[in-house]
């Protein structure tokens, strides 16, 4: 039977596939819409299989809050061109709407949700067949709370955050905290949310860094005392190039190497342990100030911390939790 433009348009609305794909599917299915949809779906599965090893680094990230339940989801693809496509954004929004309406707690639950005559997982595969790009759902996060603030950074669908509070909060203040999470990327609400493993690792790194700095200071002081510029002998390459320039002599280099070896060994063997630990603890405190939301300088008023801003608004107001997802490596 002849395929009409009306039939092609109808199938396109049903599947989102291109006009030529719809025409070919209807032709192969001899006008049977169910068979045509199956053909398009099978094409999507075939394309998805071929694209499975490709990297999907672009996409659309959206956030939604409804009746004390919030969720972030990302539908990823290969190119920004597809990510900006209205149908792609709509599919992401439709999936998020369904996830929030059903209060899904996991990505697996989202993928199993019904969508049209299939599932969310199948809808994503179908879209792969239409665009020819690998697609996958990622970054599904949920929050529940008395009040949840949501923020889509600059409405560009690339970075979204949610913040849950223990009670009703001023809308502008809530958005400000959600923006803080987007801008400053904290890893925990406060120190209690940072694992002991992370704290211990930071202490170990700080101790080693401090020891290296103490040795370096001692070496530089000894070199200066010997009338040798530390910058001229801080590496083998510098020693050679600076000798070639006539800035130092071979005797200077030999003397510098002896000083570096001797002073480094002596300083390492006589390191003031208590001082090292104190400096390391100070560096841990600085780290916790930078990565804990409540300890951070407020993005709207650097003279105050987020904790102070919240306390001024309401002494009983607390941040319960937050979520953040971005497509970009940071």
UniProtKB/Swiss-Prot annotation:
Q: What is the lineage of its organism?
A: Bacteria, Pseudomonadati, Bacteroidota, Bacteroidia, Bacteroidales
**Xref: NCBIfam families:** tsf
Annotated region Involved in Mg(2+) ion dislocation from EF-Tu: the residues are: 79-82
Q: Does the keyword Secreted apply?
A: no
- Recite the UniProt keywords alphabetically: Cytoplasm, Elongation factor, Protein biosynthesis
How is this protein named in the record? Elongation factor Ts
| GO CC list | cytoplasm
The reply to whether Protein biosynthesis figures as a keyword in the UniProt entry is: yes
Protein task? Associates with the EF-Tu.GDP complex and induces the exchange of GDP to GTP. It remains bound to the aminoacyl-tRNA.EF-Tu.GTP complex up to the GTP hydrolysis stage on the ribosome.
CDD domains tied to this protein = UBA_EF-Ts
Q: Which family does it belong to?
A: Belongs to the EF-Ts family.
Offer an example of a GO molecular function term for this protein.
translation elongation factor activity
Pfam families according to UniProt: EF_TS (PF00889)
Q: Where in the cell is it found?
A: Cytoplasm
Matching entries from InterPro entries are given as: EF-Ts_dimer_sf, Transl_elong_EFTs/EF1B, Transl_elong_EFTs/EF1B_dimer, Transl_elong_Ts_CS, UBA-like_sf
Its predominant location is cytoplasm
